């Protein structure tokens, strides 16, 4: 429930309003206004709306925690010091790929839901960010090689794999955009709340440089999944099952 409330409140707080078109420009001044006492009341009204949306009873503890987390989100955005153009919140994306399944080829839909799609300008470059909110503990936002993303083990950077997957889907919809996959760990300290993903200490602000290799590895994974000669086995990393809703 906590994650549901946070995501819904963040969505309504940032999404385009009836007076906007398909985009909404969030200014640093607006973000600063949300950090005032009146802004706190505005935030909590969005949280209460989220409870109603989830058809859940309000919980003062959850309201307090989500308020603090939304304020952290707002501070992270305000720290950019530039306008943020919101292109979408909780945006559904989909594409179709052809996968070899044994002796035949099948069409497989790839579907995702992006927490936030926005556009900012950094050092004169217009960047479209694909942001995935994370309310859990802080993870390393850097990766070493493709095995780090695709080989299932205790050190697998599955959260980076997820946002790369979203970026691949978005690339099909916005082929000309300079896409930057981002992870925003809300719990982390302010100084470590950099949402960008790094490879060999280099910030990824153009997913196109990695897209082809990622697509090839994803294709291999999908063909393993759909290969009828291979057993459909559970993950060997049982620690991943601790929070699985199907564990029981």
Where is each model-derived feature located?
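A residue-level signal for conserved active-site and pocket-lining positions in enzyme catalytic cores
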Residues: 6-7, 70, 116, 166, ...
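A non-catalytic, helix-rich entry segment at domain boundaries
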Residues: 8-97, 202-205
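Non-catalytic protein-protein interaction segments used by genome-maintenance enzymes to assemble
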Residues: 88-171
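C-terminal, charged and often intrinsically disordered regions of DNA end-processing helicases
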Residues: 1-16, 107, 237-248
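Secondary-structure transition/capping motifs at alpha-helix termini
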Residues: 16, 20, 77-84, 103, ...
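Residue-level recognition of the N-termini of beta-strands and the immediately preceding loop/turn
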Residues: 85-87, 128-129, 177-182
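Hydrophobic (often cysteine-bearing) scaffold residues that line and stabilize catalytic clefts
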Residues: 2, 6, 35, 62, ...
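Metal-dependent nuclease catalytic regions and adjoining charged, substrate-binding loops involved
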Residues: 154-160, 167-248
